[in-house]
Amino acid sequence: MNRYKFNDIENRLGVYFNNPSLIKTALTHSSFGNQFKDAKYNERLEFLGDSVLQLCITEYLFNKFKDKSEGELTKIRSLIVCENSLYEIAKKLSLGEYIRMSKGEELTGGRERMSIQADAVEAVIAAVYLDKGIGFVNDFILLHFEEMINKAINNEIVLDFKTKLQELLQKDGEILIQYELLKYEGPPHRRKFFTNVIINEKVMGIGEGYSKKEAEQNAAKEALKRLEKNYE
C-alpha cells in the first residue's frame, strides 16, 4: 500500500495509526499472502475483530435497552454484525478499493465479493483496537455502525429478501413467484447479472448484482418496497 492510499484510508476511517503495518495487514487478503510468501494477511485480525465487534455491540445494546429480553437483544445484535451488514459498512468506506489480493482473485471478482469485504471490516476493527485500545475502537464502531444499529432496532434489516417476499405473499394464499434472468454483461471476471421477479405474471421488481443470487435478492427487495405498503 503506497503512501497516498495509506493516507486516504486513514482519512476515510478517521483513524491515524501509530503502527501502520496493522491497517496494511487488515487490508491484505490471504490470496495475496499466497502469492507473496512474506506478506501477512488478515485472517487472524478478522478472528479478533469479530470478538471486539460482538463485545462493543453487546455492551451498547445491554446498556441502551434495559427493557428488552436476552432473546430480543440477541436478534438485534445478529442483524448488526451479520455479513450483509458488514458488507454495507465496507461499501460505505470503499474498503474494496484498498484490499490487497492476488491477481487471480481479483480477476474472478474478489474485489466485489461480499465475504472478502465483510471480513476486511472485522480485520480493520481489530487493527484499530490493537493500535488505539478498547475505548477508541468502541467509539469507532458506534460511529460507523450507527445507521446499521438504528435499522436493526427498527427491524429494517432483511437478510433474505426472497424469503421475506414469499412470506408476505403467502398471506394471500398460493401466489406464483418467478425469477427470470434478463441479461448479463461485462467480462467473465466482473460479470453483472440483471434479473426480474414476476408475481402472477406481472413484473414487480428488477435487480442487478455480481451473481445471479445477488440479482434475484435485489429484485425481490424492489418488489417488497412496492408491495409492503399494501399490507400495512
Swiss-Prot record:
UniProt record, GO biological process: mRNA processing; regulation of gene expression; rRNA processing; tRNA processing
Residues in DRBM domain copies = 160-229
Name the CDD domains for this protein: DSRM_RNAse_III_family, RIBOc
Q: Please list the reactions this protein catalyses.
A: Endonucleolytic cleavage to 5'-phosphomonoester
Coiled-coil stretches: none
The record places the active site at 50, 122
**What broad class of enzyme is this?**
hydrolase
Superkingdom, taxonomy of origin: Bacteria
What start and end residues bound the annotated signal peptide? none
What Pfam families does this protein's entry cite? dsrm (PF00035), Ribonucleas_3_3 (PF14622)
Q: Which cofactor does it need?
A: Mg(2+)
Q: Which UniProt keywords apply?
A: Cytoplasm, Endonuclease, Hydrolase, Magnesium, Metal-binding, mRNA processing, Nuclease, RNA-binding, rRNA processing, rRNA-binding, tRNA processing
Give the RNase III domain ranges.
Answer: 6-133
Cite the EC number. Answer: 3.1.26.3
Q: Where does Mg(2+) bind?
A: 46, 119, 122
What is its subcellular localisation? Answer: Cytoplasm
Q: Which GO terms describe its molecular function?
A: double-stranded RNA binding; metal ion binding; ribonuclease III activity; rRNA binding
Q: Name one GO cellular component term.
A: cytoplasm
Annotated function: Digests double-stranded RNA. Involved in the processing of primary rRNA transcript to yield the immediate precursors to the large and small rRNAs (23S and 16S). Processes some mRNAs, and tRNAs when they are encoded in the rRNA operon. Processes pre-crRNA and tracrRNA of type II CRISPR loci if present in the organism.
Family in the record: Belongs to the ribonuclease III family.
Assembly, per entry: Homodimer.
What is the name of the protein in this document? Ribonuclease 3
Q: What is the lineage of its organism?
A: Bacteria, Bacillati, Bacillota, Clostridia, Eubacteriales
The gene name on file is: rnc
